[in-house]
Amino acid sequence: KTPTQLQAAYQSVINTYGLTHIDFDVEGHWLAEAKSIERRSRAIAGLQAQARRAKRLLHIWYTLPVLPSGLTREGLGVLRSALRHRVDIAGVNIMAMNYGKAQAPKPTTHMGAYTIQAATSLHAQLKMIHREAGVQKTDAQLWAMVGLTPMLGHNDVKPETFTLGNAREVLAFARQKKIGLLSCWSANRDRPPAKPSANWASPKHTGIKQEVFGFSKIFRAYG
């Protein structure tokens, strides 16, 4: 599709559901698809321009993979492309999970700390790329752009485990910084296994001892 065609397709969805917020999840090989990224950025810029003319708000979020050290070069490229096309980015939701041994040397106890480190790294990166684009934002404004989505319990990368204690750490951090979003992957996994599972990471449970919706009960205190 051309940027104009893509914009029209997005606008159709926005109109159908009366959306004021939309999120673009960019991961895997799509992070390296420069033409796709540029086409999307141009389409999103057009959507926001159209919304402004209609005196409507359209909040744009991106969901991107992250390491404790921050977004990857490719992830930053997605945001830099958006800013080049004058997209007003409302926030960046980072998938705080599956870091690997090099980035997460204490995977069974420190996943909360790694999530907090990733958020702090993202904050610094957001400041950097907005300055590059000539856009000044306060620290508070930048924290409001930070979204956190940890993977509950067992992550796909064994033995990474995000615990209930980690969730409480992250909640305290979110409250302190007043971040824009606190979520999880995923609500349908927020339960203990009904029986011992051969799979380390399951789409049906966290793999750890907890009550049903134990993580949700912690995170719902943020709002």
Question: Where does each model-flagged region fall?
Answer:
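Chitinase-like catalytic core of GlcNAc-active glycosidases
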Residues: 1-133, 137, 141-167, 193-207, ...
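Catalytic domains of carbohydrate-active enzymes, especially glycoside hydrolases
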Residues: 13-22, 174-184
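Conserved active-site loop/cleft motifs that coordinate metal ions or position small ligands
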Residues: 147-150, 180-186
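Short, low-complexity, polybasic intrinsically disordered segments
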Residues: 160-181
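A short, acidic, flexible beta-alpha connecting loop/helix-capping segment that sits on the rim
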Residues: 187-192
